[in-house]
Amino acid sequence: MVRRAFGQVPGGMFGADENARIGFFDPRQGTETCGFVEQMASDEIMLLISGDPYWADHLEDVAFNSYPASLMPDYRALRYLTCPNMAISDSRNHHPGLDNSGPFLAMNPFSSRCCQHNHGFGWPYYVEHLVLATPDNGVAAVLYNSCKANVKVGDGTEITLREQTNYPFEEMTRFTVGTSENVSFPFYLRIPSWCKNASVLINGKKQQTKLAPGTYACIEREWKDGDEVVLNLPMKYAVRQWQVNKNSVSVDYGPLTLSLKIEEEYKQMPSTETAVWDSKWQEGADASAWPTFEILPASPWNYALRVQSPITLQRRNWPSDNNPFTLSSVPMEFKAQGRLVPEWKIDEYGLCGVLPYENARKSDCLDEITLVPMGAARLRISAFPVAER
C-alpha cells in the first residue's frame, strides 16, 4: 500500500523524506541513504526465504539506480536524501518541501549517523547473495557480478564457480566450472523479468533450455573441469508511465533506468558548519580532511522528453578504477531529444519543482539531450514530462 501511494517513481523506492506524507509523492521527494541499503537487505532476505526472482529484480533496481548516487565516488561523504528528480544538492534547509528541518541534501561525512553507519553494508551484502545453494544440491546464480564462489554440489563435491561480467553495463556473463572430478548437479540462472530473448551457450553450443523472463533457467547435466556457460541477456529500451505523477515517463535499458545528464559543479564546504545539528564526530577529527560537497547544476535540467524520437547508445571504455557510477566514468551514454519547460524551476523551498502538468508550455526548440544510467547521476531528472511533438 505504501509503495502504491508513494512509490510511483523510478529507482525502486518511494517518497519518504524521513516520513511518507499524504500528497508528497512527486519524484522530487527522496529516500534516506540507509533506506536504500535496508531495502536491498530486505530484498535479499526475501529472495533467500522465497526464491522468488521478483526480489532480485527489485534489488537490482535499487542497487543500480538509487544507491550509488547517494554517495560520493570515494565513499567519504554521503547525503541523507536522494531523489529520482534532483536538480540541486546543497546545504540549505529545504523544509517544508522536505519534511524535517536541516541541511539534508549536501554530501557531508559527519551528518546523518544512521546513514554513515549503514551505507557501507550495501555492496558487501549484495556480493554475499550473488551465488546461492539450492535444496536439490545445486547452485543458483541469482545476481550477476564478477566473483569466485566455492560451492558444495551433488553428493558433496566441492567446485569453484568463476563468474566474469560487467553487468549491468554489458549483456554477457561468463561462468567457468572448476572441479577435481566430474559431478552432476543442477545449475540455475535467473532470467530477469525485463529480458525477452535470453540465450545460453555451454562450451560454445547454444542450448534449448527454457529461458522465460522472471524465472530461473535450469541446466542439469554432468559437469567437468573447465566447462563454460555463457549467459546473454539482451537489453532493450522500455518506457514506463507514472500516471499518478502527471503521466510522466522514465526510460529503462535492461535493469538500468536512464536520467538526464546534468553537468555537476562541486563546491567544497566546511563539514562542521554544514552538518545537521545533532551530528557527532570524534574529538580531534581533522574536519579539513573530510570536506562536505554541494553539487550544483551547470547545465539546464528542466527538460521534457520526446518519447517518439529514437534513443541511441554510445559505449565508452570501462573505467580503470572499476567504478562505473560517475558521469566521467559511466561506460554508456544515450542520445535522445527533448524540449525545455520554462516554468519548471527551482521552487520557493530551493528544490527541484514538482513535475509540471502535461499541458505546460514547452520550448519550440527541439534539443539533443544526453541520458546516462541513473545511478551515475548525482543530479538527475529520471521522471520526465512528455514533449508530444
Features from the language model and the residues they span:
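Solvent-exposed beta-strand/loop surfaces of large extracellular or lumenal domains
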Residues: 195-220, 239-244
